[in-house]
Amino acid sequence: GVSNRILDKPAKLTDEEFAEIRKHPAWTLEILNHVSAFRHFSSDAAQHHERLDGRGYPWKIPGEKLSFTARVLAVADVYEALTATRPYRAGLPVAKVIGIMANDRGTAFDSEIFDAAVALAENGTFESLSMVTEDGFEQLQQIVPLASAEEMPARVA
């Protein structure tokens, strides 16, 4: 995986360090494919830095080919990254994070999923999802009904 030296670096990353960061989705795919309990989820997890507009990484998968789960993970990943305190900065307030992420609504993030995440964040439920509570999951399903297996986009591998 990515070295903690890079992940915890308090200064701007070099081009080489950023290139290492951009490899982690491929490592996610490889690692999860070797764990039978997670194999079915590996391509979804690996797509979490892809964007609807096809400008994500590492595979530049266009939105129509991204799985529903990957779209949810993309929103959750950025939200968590911005709200969490890191060695190099304090976590940002939820309102500021929503404002930052809103700039990518419909280009990086699925609009419906982003709107559902905003609703969860505004009522405080999104924070509790880090504990994956049944209540939070049920609220997410009410806001964005989860697609059935037949409706899911094709996975990448």
PLM region spans:
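Metal-dependent catalytic cores of enzymes that make or break cyclic nucleotides
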Residues: 1-157
